[in-house]
Amino acid sequence: EYGKTEMWYVVDCEPGASLYFGVNRALTKEEFKKRIEDNTLTDVLYKADVKKGDVFFIQSGTIHAIGAGILICEIQQNSNTTYRVYDYGRRGADGKLRELHIDKAIDVSKLTPSDTSDKQGKPEEIPGGTKCALASCPYFTTEKYVVDGEVEIDVTGDSFASLVVTEGSGKVVGSENEVEFKPTDSLFVPAGSGKIKI
């Protein structure tokens, strides 16, 4: 397997927080492996300082790590694949160090710099608020809605919708029920639900 494509939305962070994604220059597989072995890999990773509202699109095969003091909302391709090359000495439920997957990671990792530009669109005015495209790929599409009143979304039969609340409270009203929400709530809306109001 070749990993999974992900998108990170920074919900909140402490001052000076940062994360890593991709390499800051081209590497050979040999150098990549040596840097893992001698614990100098972060020297050649792209380090990004973050602020609330930042968006990072991480293609499969891109090495990445979230630093301390960051709360993200992660949207990802449906895949259970994770290859660890470093794990901060963390232990699993059994008390043993979690498995590393260095050889597999070397085989599938993208060892050229990633596109680090911000891809999110500009907010557009819609009835009841604004909508902004954050990321779109074959596996998912993400949009950010800022609601100042009532916003209507059409959940077609093409896909379900996952609503993640980062700020504020309110309710989602569908044709058959309504659900109240608050920050950090995540709501699943089945495909074909039709028009819902937030």
Protein language model features and the residues they cover:
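Conserved metal-binding segment of the jelly-roll/cupin
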Residues: 49-68, 75-77, 181-195
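Hydrophobic beta-strand residues in large extracellular and virion-surface proteins
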Residues: 172, 196-198
